[in-house]
């Protein structure tokens, strides 16, 4: 019987391991002689992904609560919306946690600057936003964990929009 071999794309595996470090603040992974770590979690992700340190409209806002972390800013040189989301340390393709965060950011900016007539589109233009949540029993829309459909940050914790707004 012939042994089966798995082949991995080095770059893809490296990217996956790096995302685990971003979503799990303090995690250190050694891979192929390289130490991977993101001591500042999602803040490190934001700093790595933005085009340059001078490319922000304001410093990255990084908040942590029980069972979640967020980081966001607006890009000075691009109007594209950029999102990264994680559930229990695994990258997702968005979901209820990301939508709740987007709603909270829009609501906070609109209420903080009532004299300006900002639309949701105006507020989200150029945003770089990332979120990581830990949920005991997450509910996903697909078996491959692509999109979170749970509505709470954690079973015991506050809803994300309430936490950010406070």
Show where each model-derived region lies.
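GHKL/Histidine-kinase-like ATPase module
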Residues: 2, 8-14, 18-145
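Flexible helix-coil linker/hinge segments at domain or subdomain boundaries
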Residues: 24, 113-116, 153-166
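Short, low-complexity, polybasic intrinsically disordered segments
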Residues: 138-161
């Amino acid at each position: 019987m012939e042994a089966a071999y798995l082949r991995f794309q080095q770059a893809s595996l490296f990217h996956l391991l790096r995302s685990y470090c971003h979503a799990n603040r303090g995690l250190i992974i050694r891979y192929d002689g390289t130490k991977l770590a993101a001591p500042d979690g999602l803040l490190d992700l934001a700093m790595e992904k933005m085009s340059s340190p001078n490319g922000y409209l304001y410093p990255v806002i990084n908040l942590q609560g029980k069972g979640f972390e967020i980081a966001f800013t607006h890009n000075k040189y691009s109007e594209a919306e950029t999102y990264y989301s994680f559930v229990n340390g695994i990258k997702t393709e968005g979901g209820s946690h990301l939508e709740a965060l987007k709603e909270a950011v829009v609501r906070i900016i609109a209420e903080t600057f009532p004299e300006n007539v900002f639309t949701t589109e105006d507020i989200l233009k150029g945003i770089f936003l990332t979120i990581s949540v830990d949920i005991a029993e997450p509910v996903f829309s697909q078996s491959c964990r692509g999109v979170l459909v749970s509505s709470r940050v954690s079973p015991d914790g506050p809803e994300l929009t309430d936490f950010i707004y406070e």
